[in-house]
């Protein structure tokens, strides 16, 4: 424990919190271009083929981003919007692609949680 005079001389250092999405550079979203679109398998004990894309951002970073929802229209050179948010069972994937923005189409036939997947409200009869 420091003495009063040590505190007067040096003071306390504030601990800077580490960003969970450093490639965004404090922005809410960033635009980027898909370089690779592929599937990967999650960590144990889960089993699936998760859809991910490697995205080169406008600030020069290249990151892996998860493609949420069932089915997608993304391919190489698609322009996408990414947001922060990791996928717990995919190591190294710390970003999500925003569905329904730029070249990424919304999820078809989605009725619940539509705003998260860029799906329009279905027509009423």
UniProtKB/Swiss-Prot annotation:
InterPro entries per the UniProt record, alphabetical: NA-bd_OB-fold, Ribosomal_uS12, Ribosomal_uS12_bac
PROSITE patterns xref list: RIBOSOMAL_S12
Example GO molecular function: tRNA binding
CDD domains, per the entry: Ribosomal_S12
Gene3D superfamilies in the record: Nucleic acid-binding proteins
GO cellular component: a single term: small ribosomal subunit
GO BP, one annotated term: translation
Record keywords, A-Z: Methylation, Ribonucleoprotein, Ribosomal protein, RNA-binding, rRNA-binding, tRNA-binding
Pfam families: Ribosom_S12_S23 (PF00164)
3-methylthioaspartic acid: residues carrying this PTM: 89
Summary of the function given for this chain in its UniProt record: With S4 and S5 plays an important role in translational accuracy. Interacts with and stabilizes bases of the 16S rRNA that are involved in tRNA selection in the A site and with the mRNA backbone. Located at the interface of the 30S and 50S subunits, it traverses the body of the 30S subunit contacting proteins on the other side and probably holding the rRNA structure together. The combined cluster of proteins S8, S12 and S17 appears to hold together the shoulder and platform of the 30S subunit.
NCBIfam families per UniProt: rpsL_bact (TIGR00981)
Family listed: Belongs to the universal ribosomal protein uS12 family.
Quaternary data: Part of the 30S ribosomal subunit. Contacts proteins S8 and S17. May interact with IF1 in the 30S initiation complex.
HAMAP family recorded: Ribosomal_uS12_B
Name recorded for this polypeptide: Small ribosomal subunit protein uS12
């Amino acid at each position: 424990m420091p003495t009063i005079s040590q505190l007067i001389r040096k003071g306390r250092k504030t601990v800077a919190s580490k960003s969970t999405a450093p490639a965004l550079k404090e922005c809410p979203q960033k635009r980027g271009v898909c370089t690779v679109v592929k599937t990967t398998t999650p960590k144990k004990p889960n089993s699936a083929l998760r859809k991910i894309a490697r995205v080169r951002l406008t600030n020069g970073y290249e990151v892996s981003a998860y493609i949420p929802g069932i089915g997608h229209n993304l391919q190489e050179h698609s322009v996408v919007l990414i947001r922060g948010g990791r996928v717990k069972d995919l190591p190294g994937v710390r970003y999500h692609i925003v569905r329904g923005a730029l070249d990424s189409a919304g999820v078809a036939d989605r009725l619940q949680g539509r705003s998260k997947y860029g799906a329009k409200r279905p027509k009423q009869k």
